[in-house]
Amino acid sequence: MTGTHLSGCPRVRGDSRPAVVVTDLDGTLLLSDGSVSERAVAALRAVAAQGTRVVFATARPAWSARGLLSAASGLGAFLVSSNGAVVSDLDGGGVRRIRAMTPATVRAEIAALGQRPWAVDREHDRLIGPGWPDILASGAGTALRVGDVPDGSPVLCLMVHIDSAAPPPALGVRGTVRWTSSGPGLLEVSAPEADKVSAVASVLAGLGIGWERVVAFGDAPNDTGLLAAAGLGVAVANASADVREAADALTACNDDDGVAAWLEGMCLCHV
């Protein structure tokens, strides 16, 4: 397997064009203002036209991600949302896979974490607990303020504010849940199989494609496993240090359209 470091011809194992491109959104594909550039959309359309399948993999809930990716409709792309809790079709919205937690499990995690500020994403809405300051950067969706997690709808993701100055907690499966993080000061709790690797693996199984033909882009701890599993894992230049160390290759930062630059190189090198 060979990669590229900011420049050069990007290839995956066997010097072939990737069959699947997987990209994170915030801090990776998206600009810092939360938008998708015209350049990025054009690059995604170019690789899709060459037969490469596109997967967007994000911590955002599906309803937020779809709003941001409206310009990328028509790609036949897959959407992995809520850190892998849901796999769906970007265009039609059909759900292919879902891994959720019971409200009782979430309440137990909140109690164990010391009643820090929290919010939860369910399939169609967000609930904000005591002390949570806003609804994050997840678009114009409404969020109901609650005192506790109610019974009823399963929970896709629990988000908890933690001290960003303290050493980060150990991430991974912890009993009946999985801990991950998409940014400093934020802990995300999901079902054990609600992670980007498991979710993308389900997409690949349906396509009959192996990981060796995947290129993945990311910037945060919740992308590390994905970059390690892919035939080529590419970190954007603004990625956290551990993600850059885990990656096979490095591209420009999100605000310099690093993903688009890499994809443009892929199109030019594999004609």
Q: Where are each of the predicted segments found?
A:
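Short hydrophobic/aromatic-enriched beta-strand-loop microsegments
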Residues: 76-82, 99, 138-139, 179-180, ...
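Active-site phosphate-binding/coordination module
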Residues: 35-135
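Short active-site oxyanion
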Residues: 51-55, 75-77, 156-157, 212-214, ...
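Asp-based phosphoryl-transfer active-site loop
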Residues: 17-34, 56, 227
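Conserved acidic, metal-coordinating active-site core of Asp-based
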Residues: 113-229, 238
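Short amphipathic alpha-helices and their capping/turn segments at secondary-structure boundaries
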Residues: 3-15, 66-71
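Mg2+-dependent phosphoryl-transfer enzymes with acidic/Ser/Thr/Gly-rich catalytic loops
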Residues: 11-12, 16-20, 37, 190, ...
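Short, structured coil segments at secondary-structure junctions
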Residues: 72-75, 82-83, 114, 173-176, ...
